[in-house]
Swiss-Prot record:
Pfam families given in the database record: CTP_transf_like (PF01467)
The EC number(s) this enzyme carries: 2.7.7.18
Pathway annotation: Cofactor biosynthesis; NAD(+) biosynthesis; deamido-NAD(+) from nicotinate D-ribonucleotide: step 1/1
Lineage of the species this protein comes from: Bacteria, Bacillati, Actinomycetota, Actinomycetes, Mycobacteriales
Annotated protein name in UniProt: Probable nicotinate-nucleotide adenylyltransferase
């Protein structure tokens, strides 16, 4: 599962758990982005902080691992590179790439997006009420074509109604984030002064 994880929240964890169950996955590898190319105009917390929050959040689930592959590579993070690196590390594994369906809507802007469906089966997780692309080979929508080709599955996850943006905004304004993120992440945010307004 790739993501900025700024911060990782319970929706990410529920999504990983649900997808692992639905697709009978042995493990879910959370991969925090190093430099998210699509967020250059936004303030993003340091990669090391996002990595450590992800480690804290996933530690209690034996099916969850965290990879530094994007952070250690340096430079902008592109999914095609992430998948190639994970494939090199696990050459015999059948890979599934879990991401938000909202991110998938912008997939045609991703570097080498046509190649990424050859590297992994994509699973787009959605928030309730989100319109899922239809299984339609004749459609001009690239996502509908991938669904029809069996290279993309879409799964609705009720807990995905939580967003990292909302968590950051709540923390910045001094509102509680308990039960939106794991307890260890709440403590990490407080200890390291994450998302404190500079005003």
């Amino acid at each position: 599962m790739g993501g900025t994880f700024d911060p990782i929240h319970n929706g990410h964890l529920v999504a990983g758990s649900e997808v692992a169950d639905l697709f009978d996955l042995d493990v879910v590898i959370y991969v925090p982005t190093g430099q998210p190319w699509q967020k250059k105009h936004k303030k993003v917390s340091a990669a090391e902080d996002r990595y450590l929050m992800t480690v804290v959040a996933t530690a209690s689930n034996p099916r969850f691992l965290v990879s530094r592959v994007d952070i250690d590579r340096g430079g902008d993070t592109y999914t095609v590179d992430t998948l190639a690196d994970i494939r090199a590390e696990y050459p015999e594994a059948e890979l599934f790439f879990i991401t938000g369906a909202d991110a998938l809507q912008k997939i045609v802007t991703w570097r080498d997006w046509e190649k990424i469906f050859d590297l992994a089966h994509f699973v787009g997780v959605t928030r309730p009420g989100y319109e899922l692309p239809k299984d339609d080979e004749g459609s001009d929508d690239p996502l509908s074509k991938e669904v029809a080709a069996g290279r993309l599955s879409l799964v609705e996850i009720p807990a995905m109604a939580i967003s990292s943006t909302d968590v950051r905004e709540r923390a910045t304004s001094g509102r509680p984030v308990w039960y939106l993120v794991p307890d260890g992440v709440v403590q990490y945010i407080a200890k390291h002064g994450m998302y404190v307004s500079s005003e």
